[in-house]
């Protein structure tokens, strides 16, 4: 799917709640994202699993809501279940996430707190964004010699998404 068609169905300037790895897990995933982006001319972004995305609001209020959500969510583990890809710019190549009751509870809590009604949710950790052929994605998959199988979620983060300029910023 071309970027333009993705943009027409999404809030291109919005906020998201991210679950992010730390320490060595973050370092490994960050290196893989940078390597793929460099090799295949993709944008750089921090490794993350999106909990909720596409919402709007005043940043100060969203930060308070993020803190409230964070206090209510108990730490849990994100477990990966292989590599997959779609013909979509923002889910071009990704690690599938095993859905767990803790992840589901965190999602419901975040959606409730943010008054967000989006029901579609496919938890994943993107490795590259872009429009690539199946052949290119095959080469990418072959380059994934080893990828972590899980990471601990101890905090959540508010991120600003600028999908027009392909820039993402973790606010807090």
Descriptions of predicted regions:
Residues 95-97, 158:
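Short beta-strand element of the conserved SAM-dependent methyltransferase core
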Residues 1-77, 97-152, 164-172:
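Basic, often amphipathic N-terminal segments
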Residues 84-94:
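Short, basic/glycine-rich phosphate-binding loops at helix/coil junctions
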Residues 88, 154-166:
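Glycine-rich beta-strand-turn "strand-cap" elements at beta-sheet edges
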């Amino acid at each position: 799917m071309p970027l333009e068609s993705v943009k027409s169905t999404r809030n291109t300037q919005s906020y998201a709640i991210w679950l992010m790895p730390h320490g060595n897990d973050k370092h490994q995933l960050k290196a893989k994202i940078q390597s793929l982006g460099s090799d295949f001319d993709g944008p750089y972004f921090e490794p993350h699993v999106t909990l909720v995305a596409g919402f709007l609001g005043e940043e100060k209020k969203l930060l308070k809501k993020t803190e409230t959500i964070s206090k209510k969510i108990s730490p849990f583990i994100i477990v990966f279940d292989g590599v997959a890809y779609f013909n979509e710019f923002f889910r071009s190549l990704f690690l599938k996430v095993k859905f767990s009751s803790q992840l589901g509870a965190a999602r419901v809590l975040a959606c409730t707190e943010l008054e967000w009604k989006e029901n579609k949710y496919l938890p994943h950790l993107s490795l590259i964004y872009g429009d690539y052929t199946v052949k290119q994605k095959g080469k990418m998959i072959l380059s994934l010699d080893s990828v972590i199988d899980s990471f601990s979620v101890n905090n959540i983060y508010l991120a600003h998404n600028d999908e027009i300029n392909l820039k993402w910023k973790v606010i807090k």
